[in-house]
Amino acid sequence: MQPIFWQWDGLTISSYAVCMVLGLIAGTLASLGEARRQHIESARVLDAILAASVLGVIAARLGYVLINWAYYQDHSGEIVRLWLGGLSWQAGLIGGSIGAWLVARRHPPAMLVLDLLAIGAALGICFGWIGSYLSATAFGKELFPGQPFFFLAIDAPDGYGQTNPRWPTQLIGAAWALLLFLALWLTRKRVWRVGARYWLFIAAYSFGAFVLGFTRGDDVLTVSGWRIDQILDALLFSTALIALVRLRLKRRPAPQPDAPAEASASQS
């Protein structure tokens, strides 16, 4: 663990903050690269990224604080200290999507821009998990000798600094996000329905996050024994799955009839 990236003469830069910046830069470059390939104006995408980043980070932090209220009710001074780590991907996705859509809808189709942002979001989330690993947030449950997956254990601290063999939850999350980014990037040249990549990303990542929730050791709100973040993952997965099915069932647009001039030319 290395929560402090750089420190000099009272100035401290956290590793989590560095990972956030790197994730934003890498995700932006990935989305812009795909936008150029599709001949979409870069300024349009950058405006959406800016709106998504601002609303997404605010929503993600608020969501994380609410989910982990058991900790923050006794550490209220840390709520605004974003650089210490702690973002909810579910709240960030909702807030970021709303921000991007509000900007992108001025030049429809808005979902086309969200498709581009999904590629960058996957890469950005990967850096976010690395930041969580370095800052000991979203840590894994303890593992004990004799348990089936003890061979995966790493010595890692929890939010209170207690180091024990734990699930490598943050590293698994980073690997899953990176895998999704590679899948979206390598298939970017195929023909996609507008909105398909966005919903596919949400479905795939929320499924992985739901499964990963069983390995997390941070104390969060629960409902009927289920972690609140897993409940949100399940809701996002269901929503994305319904959207994908609707896209699949949507009839392709009928071919347009030839223009009158073209029809006359063909008859002559």
List where the protein language model places each region.
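A feature for loop-to-transmembrane-helix boundaries and adjacent hydrophobic helices
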Residues: 1-268
